[in-house]
C-alpha cells in the first residue's frame, strides 16, 4: 500500500520506517506541507498521512480523492483541521491516533505551571548575566491552592492526580464527570464558577465546535488576577 507522509521530519522517517519493516506498506516521505498546491504530489498514493498543520479542507480532499487516495491517516489525536463531512462525501476514510501517553502531556502542563510560577526562564537569564537577586522571581506555594481542570478525560485526570499530590484543591468542568476525580475530592462546577474560584486553570479538552472560543475575553475577566498572570 503506497503511503505518502506530508510534513515529514527526519524523526518521522526513522520511526515510521522501523515500524513498517516487514509490512506491506510502501512509505514515501514529503517534507512539504499538504496544501491545495502540493496535493498533486499524492497522485497515485492510496494513503496520505498528514500532520496537524496540513490542510485537509474540502478542496484539498477533493484533489486527493481524484488522485486515487482512499485513506487519510492523521499523525495526531486532534482532527479539527479535517473537513469530515467532505471526506465522507468523497468516500475518504479518516483515522487518527487513538491514544498516546496522557502522563507526558499532563507532566508537561505541570512543568509549565512550575516554570511560570517560579519565573524559571527569567531566573535562568539573570544568572547567566551574573545576577542572583530574587526580586520579581518569588512565586507561591502550590500546596493548598485551588486548581481548575477544564476537561477531565485521560489527560485531565492524569493532571489532576499530579496536582492532588502537590496538595492542591481540585475543581473540574466537564459534561461527563470522571469518577476518578470525584474520588480525589474534586468538585464539578459550571465553567464561570470554576474560573472565579481557581487560582490556576489548566485546559485539557479537544478543539471542537463545542469548545471553540471556550475561553474568551469575557471569561478571562472572570479569573483571578494572579491566575491570569501565571497560566
What do the predicted segments below correspond to?
Residues 135-224:
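Rossmann-like dinucleotide/phosphate-binding beta-alpha-beta segment
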Residues 2-93, 216:
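An N-terminal-biased, well-structured beta-alpha scaffold segment characteristic
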Residues 78-81, 101-104, 178:
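Short gly/pro/ser/thr-enriched loop/turn and capping motifs at secondary-structure boundaries
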Residues 13, 57, 61, 106, ...:
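A general structural signal for well-ordered alpha-helical segments in protein cores
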Residues 25-31, 48-51, 126, 177-184, ...:
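Short, flexible loop segments at the rims of nucleotide/cofactor-binding pockets, characterized by
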Residues 90-92, 98-146, 158-161, 165:
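Phosphate-binding beta-alpha-beta segment of Rossmann-like dinucleotide-binding domains, i.e.
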Residues 229-231:
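Conserved small/polar residues in nucleotide/adenosyl-binding loops
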